[in-house]
Amino acid sequence: LFSLNHCGFKVVKDGDDKNYNVINFEDIGNSNINYTIQRNLVRSQNNQNLVDLNISIETILNKNIKEKNISNRVTKYELIVMSKVKILVIDKNKEYEFTITDKGELKASNKINKLKYDENSILLRLANNISNQIDRKITSILNDI
């Protein structure tokens, strides 16, 4: 019977305690989505044990027609958000790049107000999903350093 203690694996924390501090955040593209991502990633923490990062993000939003009905009217749109993220770990002077994509479906409406409200709700959900994925990716990168 063998017991493997101290095998070298670390438990990845998926909690609210962040191990990084964003010093500089640059964004290009859709300002609403980028603002939501920035708000979720940038926190004012003055802990000395945090790793300082510069984050640059380029967000592209595509709205494609997904379905049409018999009378050739649009019934569904597909919203695709793609974010290209560049992270610079200031202490190590290492740069990492990755791309995160998320998509959602929007039902067309005759009322423009309802369509805009539904579109903004879906984009907010997609931005929150992307910021959570970016956060997990940053945490994974910093755990590997």
What does each of the following model-derived ranges do?
Residues 2-24:
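Bacterial Sec signal peptide processing site at the extreme N-terminus
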